[in-house]
């Protein structure tokens, strides 16, 4: 991944591990053609609108995935939000409010699932003890490879 140019038209980035190309358009509506991998983005305030859209999409996708994984794990959480965090992919507060960086959307879905399971494991274990990692491993047996992907590629995910 490369840093985006000032003019975003034609810029490509990964969205859940799939190529997404920006096409600047006149008008006011953002639309995404998932089949073709094209994000139609209004020219006016394009960068700001893109980040807002990414946060909204991240909250929706990550809320759905967190619900699904929480049911699978038999655990509960208070809420889900998407932030602009650049130093943490996710966090779980003492009252089980979960926050994710919207930049997780740039990672493959399997990596996102690891972060979701990691944060949900914190609803039971508020540390990174052996019990915590056993909980993660129960639901994501290859968590080490997924965590390594984040460590190896995290810097590439700071495009917006």
PLM region descriptions:
Residues 116:
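Walker B beta-strand of ABC/ABC-like P-loop ATPase nucleotide-binding domains
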Residues 1-113, 123-160:
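Active-site-proximal or metal-binding-adjacent scaffold patches in catalytic folds
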Residues 119:
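Walker B catalytic acidic pair
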């Amino acid at each position: 991944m490369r840093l985006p140019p000032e003019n975003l038209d034609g810029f490509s980035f990964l969205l859940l591990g799939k190529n997404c190309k920006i096409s600047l358009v006149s008008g006011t509506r953002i639309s995404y053609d998932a089949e073709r991998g094209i994000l139609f983005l209004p020219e006016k305030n394009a960068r700001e609108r893109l980040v807002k859209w990414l946060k909204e999409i991240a909250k929706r996708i990550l809320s759905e995935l967190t619900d699904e994984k929480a049911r699978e794990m038999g655990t509960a959480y208070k809420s889900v939000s998407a932030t602009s965090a650049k130093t943490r992919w996710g966090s779980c507060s003492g009252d089980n409010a979960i926050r994710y960086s919207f930049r997780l959307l740039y990672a493959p879905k399997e990596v996102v699932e690891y972060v979701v399971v990691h944060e949900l494991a914190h609803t039971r274990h508020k540390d990174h003890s052996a019990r915590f990692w056993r909980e993660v491993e129960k639901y994501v047996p290859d968590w080490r490879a997924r965590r390594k992907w984040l460590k190896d590629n995290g810097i590439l995910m700071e495009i917006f």
